[in-house]
Protein backbone atom coordinates (compact mmCIF):
# COMPACT_ATOMS: atom_id res chain seq x y z
CA UNK A 1 0.00 0.00 0.00
CA UNK A 2 1.33 3.42 -0.96
CA UNK A 3 1.19 6.00 1.81
CA UNK A 4 0.39 9.71 1.66
CA UNK A 5 1.40 11.33 4.96
CA UNK A 6 0.12 14.88 5.40
CA UNK A 7 1.42 16.76 8.42
CA UNK A 8 -0.71 19.74 9.40
CA UNK A 9 0.67 23.06 10.55
CA UNK A 10 0.98 26.72 9.67
CA UNK A 11 3.71 27.98 7.34
CA UNK A 12 6.25 30.55 8.50
CA UNK A 13 9.11 30.61 10.99
CA UNK A 14 6.96 32.29 13.66
CA UNK A 15 4.98 29.02 13.96
CA UNK A 16 8.06 26.80 14.35
CA UNK A 17 7.88 24.66 17.52
CA UNK A 18 4.27 25.60 18.26
CA UNK A 19 1.82 22.96 19.41
CA UNK A 20 -0.32 23.37 16.29
CA UNK A 21 2.70 22.53 14.10
CA UNK A 22 3.56 19.03 15.35
CA UNK A 23 2.36 17.64 12.01
CA UNK A 24 4.96 19.75 10.21
CA UNK A 25 7.54 18.71 12.80
CA UNK A 26 7.02 15.02 12.11
CA UNK A 27 7.23 15.56 8.35
CA UNK A 28 10.50 17.46 8.87
CA UNK A 29 11.84 14.57 10.97
CA UNK A 30 10.91 12.02 8.27
CA UNK A 31 12.52 14.17 5.58
CA UNK A 32 15.74 14.48 7.59
CA UNK A 33 15.84 10.82 8.62
CA UNK A 34 15.45 9.63 5.03
CA UNK A 35 17.93 12.18 3.61
CA UNK A 36 15.26 13.85 1.48
CA UNK A 37 14.54 17.45 0.63
CA UNK A 38 11.19 19.14 0.36
CA UNK A 39 10.12 20.48 -3.02
CA UNK A 40 7.60 23.25 -3.45
CA UNK A 41 4.40 22.83 -5.42
CA UNK A 42 1.55 25.32 -5.81
CA UNK A 43 0.26 25.30 -2.22
CA UNK A 44 2.24 22.57 -0.48
CA UNK A 45 5.74 21.17 -0.01
CA UNK A 46 6.43 17.51 -0.64
CA UNK A 47 9.01 14.76 -0.72
CA UNK A 48 8.47 11.32 -2.17
CA UNK A 49 10.49 8.13 -2.05
CA UNK A 50 10.13 4.37 -2.15
CA UNK A 51 10.49 1.77 0.55
CA UNK A 52 10.66 -1.64 -1.03
CA UNK A 53 7.86 -1.47 -3.61
CA UNK A 54 5.78 1.11 -1.72
CA UNK A 55 5.62 4.79 -2.59
CA UNK A 56 5.70 7.18 0.36
CA UNK A 57 4.73 10.83 -0.16
CA UNK A 58 5.24 13.40 2.61
CA UNK A 59 3.22 16.64 2.43
CA UNK A 60 3.21 19.96 4.30
CA UNK A 61 0.26 22.15 3.22
CA UNK A 62 1.17 25.84 2.87
CA UNK A 63 -2.44 27.01 3.11
CA UNK A 64 -2.58 27.59 6.86
CA UNK A 65 -4.30 25.10 9.10
CA UNK A 66 -7.92 26.09 8.52
CA UNK A 67 -7.61 25.64 4.74
CA UNK A 68 -5.64 22.38 4.73
CA UNK A 69 -8.31 20.58 2.72
CA UNK A 70 -7.71 22.82 -0.29
CA UNK A 71 -4.60 20.86 -1.34
CA UNK A 72 -6.23 17.47 -1.82
CA UNK A 73 -7.50 17.79 -5.39
CA UNK A 74 -3.94 18.71 -6.44
CA UNK A 75 -2.19 16.13 -4.27
CA UNK A 76 -4.39 13.15 -5.15
CA UNK A 77 -4.05 13.95 -8.85
CA UNK A 78 -0.29 14.56 -8.84
CA UNK A 79 0.65 11.47 -6.82
CA UNK A 80 -2.11 9.09 -7.97
CA UNK A 81 -3.27 8.59 -4.40
CA UNK A 82 -6.71 7.97 -2.94
CA UNK A 83 -8.32 8.52 0.43
CA UNK A 84 -7.40 5.00 1.60
CA UNK A 85 -3.70 5.93 1.21
CA UNK A 86 -4.06 9.00 3.44
CA UNK A 87 -2.65 9.48 6.94
CA UNK A 88 -3.07 12.97 8.43
CA UNK A 89 -0.75 13.95 11.30
CA UNK A 90 -2.29 16.50 13.63
CA UNK A 91 -2.05 18.00 17.11
CA UNK A 92 -4.57 16.99 19.76
CA UNK A 93 -5.24 19.00 22.91
CA UNK A 94 -7.32 16.19 24.41
CA UNK A 95 -4.26 13.95 24.64
CA UNK A 96 -1.53 14.58 27.20
CA UNK A 97 1.81 15.80 25.92
CA UNK A 98 3.83 12.81 24.70
CA UNK A 99 0.84 10.55 24.01
CA UNK A 100 -0.18 9.52 20.47
CA UNK A 101 -3.26 7.96 18.97
CA UNK A 102 -3.55 6.29 15.56
CA UNK A 103 -7.04 5.88 14.09
CA UNK A 104 -8.46 4.63 10.81
CA UNK A 105 -11.37 7.11 10.88
CA UNK A 106 -12.65 9.86 13.12
CA UNK A 107 -14.36 13.19 13.44
CA UNK A 108 -12.97 16.71 13.33
CA UNK A 109 -13.89 17.59 16.93
CA UNK A 110 -12.63 21.15 17.46
CA UNK A 111 -9.82 20.86 14.91
CA UNK A 112 -10.37 23.20 11.96
CA UNK A 113 -7.65 21.55 9.87
CA UNK A 114 -9.40 18.18 10.07
CA UNK A 115 -12.75 19.85 9.42
CA UNK A 116 -11.35 21.45 6.25
CA UNK A 117 -9.95 18.11 5.06
CA UNK A 118 -13.17 16.21 5.77
CA UNK A 119 -15.21 18.84 3.91
CA UNK A 120 -12.83 18.76 0.94
CA UNK A 121 -12.85 14.95 0.77
CA UNK A 122 -16.55 14.59 1.55
CA UNK A 123 -15.58 11.90 4.03
CA UNK A 124 -14.11 11.28 7.47
CA UNK A 125 -12.84 7.83 6.48
CA UNK A 126 -9.12 8.51 6.38
CA UNK A 127 -6.28 7.68 8.76
CA UNK A 128 -5.25 10.09 11.47
CA UNK A 129 -2.24 10.20 13.72
CA UNK A 130 -2.93 12.44 16.69
CA UNK A 131 0.01 13.81 18.64
CA UNK A 132 -0.89 14.94 22.14
CA UNK A 133 0.13 18.50 22.96
CA UNK A 134 -1.60 18.72 26.33
CA UNK A 135 -3.99 21.45 27.36
CA UNK A 136 -3.91 24.45 29.64
CA UNK A 137 -7.27 25.88 30.63
CA UNK A 138 -5.58 29.14 31.66
CA UNK A 139 -5.27 29.96 27.94
CA UNK A 140 -7.88 30.31 25.23
CA UNK A 141 -7.61 27.25 22.96
CA UNK A 142 -6.37 29.29 19.99
CA UNK A 143 -3.65 30.94 22.08
CA UNK A 144 -2.59 27.63 23.58
CA UNK A 145 -2.19 25.72 20.29
CA UNK A 146 -0.24 28.64 18.82
CA UNK A 147 2.10 28.76 21.83
CA UNK A 148 5.61 27.36 21.60
CA UNK A 149 6.77 24.34 23.57
CA UNK A 150 9.11 25.09 26.45
CA UNK A 151 12.52 23.37 26.47
CA UNK A 152 11.50 20.30 28.49
CA UNK A 153 8.32 19.86 26.43
CA UNK A 154 10.33 20.14 23.22
CA UNK A 155 12.58 17.28 24.35
CA UNK A 156 9.51 15.10 24.84
CA UNK A 157 8.08 16.09 21.45
CA UNK A 158 11.37 15.22 19.75
CA UNK A 159 11.25 11.80 21.45
CA UNK A 160 7.74 11.36 20.02
CA UNK A 161 9.03 12.28 16.55
CA UNK A 162 11.91 9.80 16.85
CA UNK A 163 9.52 7.01 17.82
CA UNK A 164 6.92 7.82 15.17
CA UNK A 165 9.53 8.14 12.43
CA UNK A 166 10.35 4.48 13.07
CA UNK A 167 6.73 3.33 13.25
CA UNK A 168 4.61 5.07 10.64
CA UNK A 169 6.50 4.26 7.47
CA UNK A 170 5.64 0.60 8.09
CA UNK A 171 1.89 1.22 8.07
CA UNK A 172 0.03 -0.72 5.41
CA UNK A 173 -3.32 -2.46 5.08
CA UNK A 174 -1.95 -5.54 6.86
CA UNK A 175 -0.18 -3.85 9.77
CA UNK A 176 -2.57 -1.01 10.63
CA UNK A 177 -4.17 -2.75 13.62
CA UNK A 178 -0.76 -3.76 15.00
CA UNK A 179 0.52 -0.20 14.56
CA UNK A 180 -2.56 1.13 16.34
CA UNK A 181 -1.73 -1.05 19.35
CA UNK A 182 1.96 -0.09 19.32
CA UNK A 183 1.50 3.64 18.82
CA UNK A 184 -1.52 4.07 21.08
CA UNK A 185 0.19 2.32 24.00
CA UNK A 186 3.28 4.55 23.79
CA UNK A 187 3.91 7.60 25.94
CA UNK A 188 6.89 9.94 26.19
UniProtKB/Swiss-Prot annotation:
UniProt keyword annotations, A-Z: Cytoplasm, Hydrolase, RNA-binding, tRNA-binding
Primary localisation category: cytoplasm
Transmembrane annotation, as ranges: none
Keyword Transmembrane: no
GO MF, one example: tRNA binding
Active site: 20 (proton acceptor)
InterPro entries: Pept_tRNA_hydro (IPR001328), Pept_tRNA_hydro_CS (IPR018171), Pept_tRNA_hydro_sf (IPR036416)
Compartments it resides in: Cytoplasm
PROSITE patterns from the UniProt entry: PEPT_TRNA_HYDROL_1, PEPT_TRNA_HYDROL_2
GO terms under biological process: protein quality control for misfolded or incompletely synthesized proteins; rescue of stalled ribosome
Reaction equations catalysed: an N-acyl-L-alpha-aminoacyl-tRNA + H2O = an N-acyl-L-amino acid + a tRNA + H(+)
Listed Pfam families: Pept_tRNA_hydro
Amino acids binding tRNA: 15, 64, 66, 112
Annotated positions for site Stabilizes the basic form of H active site to accept a proton: 91
GO CC annotation: cytoplasm
Similarity comment: family membership: Belongs to the PTH family.
Name of the protein: Peptidyl-tRNA hydrolase
Species for this entry: Borrelia duttonii (strain Ly)
Phylogenetic classification of the source organism: Bacteria, Pseudomonadati, Spirochaetota, Spirochaetia, Spirochaetales
Amino acid sequence: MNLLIVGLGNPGSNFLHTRHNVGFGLIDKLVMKNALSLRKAKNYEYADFNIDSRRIVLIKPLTYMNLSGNIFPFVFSKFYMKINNLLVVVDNVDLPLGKCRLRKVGGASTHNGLRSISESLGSTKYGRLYIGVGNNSAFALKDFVLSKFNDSELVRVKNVFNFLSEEILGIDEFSFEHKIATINSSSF
